[in-house]
């Protein structure tokens, strides 16, 4: 089954077929994971190939995916990279959504704590435009806060709303990166 994050789920594999299925996946040079309390596959809009795309969305998303995919966290964690204002809603629906800055060309703005599902919540905009090379540091910092303060089954947004001082810590850290 294909998932909304561009991964596949193998359903109905019996225990006796599990090892050969894993070997087949590895032989095809595909990776295992994408479920449980981990950072999920980083999603991207079609921005690289879109006439409104403002940067190479796919290359940036791939770099972030290589660094963060599969990291253990208290509950699932979703990162998305989007290329223009048309994807603002998608950026706000991620644990971390990354978009180009519309006030400082060549920089990026981040939305944190978005949720979908039966209780959707818009991610909060962190109003500190960051250079591309600082975005991974910002994500790493947020993940560290989540891993340090969260416990299963809390999502990032719950952790941040329960300990409001963490929002301020994130803002201070982002400002230090932007200097």
Where are these regions (language model features)?
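Flexible, glycine/charged-enriched surface loops at secondary-structure junctions
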Residues: 1-4, 35-36, 73-77, 148-162, ...
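Small-residue-enriched alpha-helical segments and adjacent helix-cap loops
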Residues: 1-103
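Catalytic cores of large soluble enzymes that bind and process phosphate-bearing ligands
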Residues: 13-14, 49-56, 127-134, 148, ...
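Terminal amphipathic helices with adjacent charged low-complexity linkers/tails
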Residues: 16-17, 165-169, 173-176
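Structural signal for hydrophobic packing residues in well-ordered secondary-structure cores
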Residues: 25-32, 68, 72, 139, ...
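A generic structural signal for ordered alpha-helices
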Residues: 42, 62, 74-76, 113-116, ...
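Generic hydrophobic segment detector
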Residues: 58-63, 68-69, 75, 122-127, ...
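Mobile "lid/hinge" segments at catalytic clefts and subdomain interfaces of large enzymes
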Residues: 83, 87, 92-155, 169
